[in-house]
Every structure is written in structure tokens, then in C-alpha cells.
Amino acid sequence: MIDGDGYRLNVGIVICNNHGQVFWAKRYGQHSWQFPQGGIDEGETPEQAMFRELYEEVGLTKKDVKIIATSRHWLRYKLPKRLVRWDSKPVCIGQKQKWFLLRLECDESRINMQRGKSPEFDGWRWVSYWYPVRQVVSFKRDVYRRAMKEFASLAMPFRERKTKGKRKKQRR
């Protein structure tokens, strides 16, 4: 769905593990990496779209994750002019995204990027929380920064919950 301003309605997905790391996926056949994301179909809620995309792109289901947070606002980015398909109607000039922070509740061996009709990703890894903001393609960087900033206080405690009650040396 494309809104009246030319933005495709979309969801972005940040998956955290219990170590405060985030799931980072390599685009199929490319050298670029990103979070899972995808369009919202007609009649679908953002949450329904998120679970559909999560399964299609990562192979995970509702029971494999827990929703920790949803972005308060829609976050938008414009596509570079060279990526706009001017001959499509309506013309899509960018993405308008609702972001979800999920915690992985299953073993990571359940991740399977081959479940969708045409795989979006061909590799993945866990990275430090802020790594994606520095590494994502430049036109998505501000949206990533805003989503990650909004979720930071909720994502970081995953690490502390595992070690609660144990003294841990501070790393510097």
C-alpha cells in the first residue's frame, strides 16, 4: 500500500537476543546488510504484516519471539532518485515504517531464511546493538538511528536479566 504522499507502508523488525545483540541480515546476492522489513498488504495491520514478514524472511513464527515494543510513530525515509520506479502507478518515493522490537524466545537454529517464495537474505549474524546504524545504506540511516534510539532502553536490559544477581566485571 502506498499512502497519499507516495510512501509505501512498511514494517521494520529488530530482533534482539539475551546478550543485547541484534539480528543483522545480508541481502540475497549482495554485499549489503539490513534488518528484516516488508510491505503492509491491503487489510493487514502492522503487527500482522510483521509476523508475515518475519516468517517469510527469517522463518520465525509468533511463538519464537516476544514483542517488546512498537515504534510510537511512523518513521519515513526517501529513496534515492535512482531507485524510484517512475513508471509505476502510484509512484513510490520511499518507505513509511512502523518498527517492532522483538526478543528471540527460541533457539537460533530455528532461523531459516529459505521459507519464503523468494529469499530476501542469504546470511545473518548477531551484531552489537548500535552496529546497524553505522553500517546500513545511507538513505536508511536516520530511520535506523531513530528506531534504535527509541528501543535502546528496552533492548539493553536483555543482557542484565541473564546475569541478575551475579557481579560482573565492567569492561572499558
Curated annotation (Swiss-Prot):
Listed EC numbers: 3.6.1.-
GO biological process assignments: mRNA catabolic process
Which cofactors?
A: a divalent metal cation
| Nudix hydrolase domain sequence ranges | 6-149
PROSITE patterns in UniProt: NUDIX, NUDIX_BOX
Gene Ontology, cellular component aspect: cytoplasm
Briefly state the protein's biological role: Accelerates the degradation of transcripts by removing pyrophosphate from the 5'-end of triphosphorylated RNA, leading to a more labile monophosphorylated state that can stimulate subsequent ribonuclease cleavage.
HAMAP family linked: Nudix_RppH
Record protein name field: RNA pyrophosphohydrolase
**Biological source species:** Vibrio campbellii (strain ATCC BAA-1116)
